[in-house]
């Protein structure tokens, strides 16, 4: 019975020591942090090509920093990777133009990015949709 109690006590001491070390590390990170509150961040610049891992530079008074960032490879370049939008469903296909459109309302601007409040996106109607429409027309005539 004694070895079991000794092991339990040892485990509790190790757990307490680990928690104390984590707390000390967290306090150290806070002390290294900046007192400056008004940071201005630039855009995320990818290391290669136009997406993937990269860096963003920020400045506040005399201080400057670089943060790691990531640009998704499916981002819409004209909106910027730091502008997040909530999009509605795609509208119907226009017979005149052959495109369908939808709008997006700004949800969040990251790192003080300058974003448009509302954006509009259009894309061509797919051949698959046209084929489905023709198939439906044919079935109704029988």
UniProtKB/Swiss-Prot annotation:
UniProt keyword Signal present: yes
Record's keyword terms, sorted: Basement membrane, Developmental protein, Differentiation, Disulfide bond, Extracellular matrix, Growth factor, Heparin-binding, Mitogen, Secreted, Signal
Induction: By retinoic acid.
Family matches, as InterPro entries: Midkine_heparin-bd_GF (IPR000762), PTN/MK_C_dom (IPR020090), PTN/MK_C_dom_sf (IPR038130), PTN/MK_diS_sf (IPR020091), PTN/MK_N_dom (IPR020089), PTN/MK_N_dom_sf (IPR037122), PTN_MK_heparin-bd_GF_CS (IPR020092)
SMART domains: PTN
Disulfide bond among keywords: yes
GO biological process per UniProt: cell differentiation; positive regulation of cell division
Disulfide bonds: 36-60, 44-69, 51-73, 83-115, 93-125
GO cellular component, one term: cell surface
Location relative to the cell: Cell surface; Secreted, Extracellular space, Extracellular matrix, Basement membrane
PROSITE patterns listed in its UniProt record: PTN_MK_1 (PS00619), PTN_MK_2 (PS00620)
Signal peptide interval: 1-21
Gene Ontology MF term list: growth factor activity; heparin binding
Main localization (coarse): other
Function: Has mitogenic activity, and neurite extension activity for PC12 cells.
PANTHER family: MIDKINE (PTHR13850:SF2), PLEIOTROPHIN FAMILY MEMBER (PTHR13850)
UniProt record similarity statement: Belongs to the pleiotrophin family.
Protein name: Midkine
Organism: Gallus gallus
Lineage: Eukaryota, Metazoa, Chordata, Craniata, Vertebrata
Gene giving rise to this polypeptide: RIHB
């Amino acid at each position: 019975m004694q070895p079991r109690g000794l092991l339990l006590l040892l485990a509790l001491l190790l757990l307490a020591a680990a928690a104390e070390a984590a707390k000390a590390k967290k306090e150290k990170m806070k002390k290294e942090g900046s007192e400056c509150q008004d940071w201005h961040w630039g855009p995320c610049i990818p290391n290669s090509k136009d997406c993937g891992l990269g860096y963003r530079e920020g400045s506040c008074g005399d201080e400057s920093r670089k943060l790691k960032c990531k640009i998704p490879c499916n981002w819409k370049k004209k909106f910027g990777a730091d502008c997040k939008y909530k999009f509605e469903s795609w509208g119907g296909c226009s017979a005149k133009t052959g495109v369908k459109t939808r709008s997006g309302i700004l949800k969040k601007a990251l790192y003080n990015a300058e974003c448009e409040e509302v954006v509009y996106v259009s894309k061509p109607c797919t051949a698959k949709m046209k084929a489905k429409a023709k198939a439906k027309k044919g079935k109704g005539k029988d």
